[in-house]
Amino acid sequence: MGSRILVINPGSTSTKVAIFNEGKISFDAEVSHPRERIDKFSTVMEQKEFRSAAVMDLIKDELAKGTPDMVVGRGGLLKPIPGGPYSINDAMISDLESGRYGVHPCNLGAILAREFAEFWEVPSMIMDPVVTDEMDPVAKVTGLPEIKRRSVFHALSQRGVARSVAAEMGLEYEQAKFIVGHMGGGVSIGAHRYGKVVDVINALDGEGPFSPERSGTLPILPVLNLVESGQYTFDEMRKVVTSRSGVLGLLGTNDMREVQARMEEGDDEARLVLEALVYNASKYICSFIPALMKDDPQKRPIDAIILTGGVARSKLLVKAVEDVVGFIAPVKVVTGLEEMEVMGRGGLAVLRGEMQPQEYHSD
């Protein structure tokens, strides 16, 4: 079997694809989807044909060079499972389509991967889905008995950049301590302690700092008042806090380049929002110091704070965060297609028999 691998990664406002040949990226592309176009769909699943057409448009010229031997999709919101590769099966597709464990465009990753793989009659898989769960039990406890915190984060991105930085620093990932912040349309932060992600900021459930599109942590009673007053239904509120708030709600745009330009032109409101974004991100990064010091008798220092994701491309924002949290550990920035590379490497390892894909079973 060859090792030509197609990787599909649907995000909140973009779709990325990459083609790997013998473990190296031979082609990668990304298409941005304007918010007004995405908002025409009432559900994520309604975007399937739109996203499928976007993928085909990106790769159509590459298909003349040969069809893939495997398709790897971004993992979606499934039940909590260990990390690693998983074959895409009916149980997985059912849970993703129904939104049983949550609704997000990443749910389309496995669905699109399987669709293309079945057309070419090749295997399909996901790698390190966002529901990878290695949280310490103590980190899941809340003050409300009916609610436990969930491990939902950018597992693929965070593990990929953490391993990359560990290698750069001459460390084994399993021997290092990192705080990793993925800053995209949503922000997730993870405490990586000796190879396990023992606590996370779960942006999907509304935790953590606000981001370009999400509200982040909110005082709960005012939120309940908004719903009780009839200003929002439950479904409307869920959509607002997960995709129509944050910088978008405050300034009317989720494009951080536009916000930065407005600030540089003297827009005081844009300046305040950017300063608040940096303050909130820094505050939650610092909140993970206990997670990395807990159960470590040597109290070994944190090796690095790692920033990744689209927002990490802004030198101004990265410098502002570094000025606040740099006293804890060196700040490393990793941008680019790390998620795509991690998925491609995972697919290659499976094709070569170096890793065995696990089977997903629905509860």
From Swiss-Prot:
The keyword Transferase applies. GO terms for biological process: acetate metabolic process. GO terms for molecular function: acetate kinase activity; ATP binding; butyrate kinase activity. InterPro entries: Aliphatic_acid_kin_short-chain (IPR000890), Aliphatic_acid_kinase_CS (IPR023865), ATPase_NBD (IPR043129), Butyrate_kin (IPR011245). Pfam families: Acetate_kinase. One of its GO terms (cellular component) is cytoplasm. Its main location: cytoplasm. NCBIfam families: butyr_kinase, PRK03011.1-5. It is an enzyme of class 2 (transferase). This is Probable butyrate kinase. HAMAP family: Butyrate_kinase.
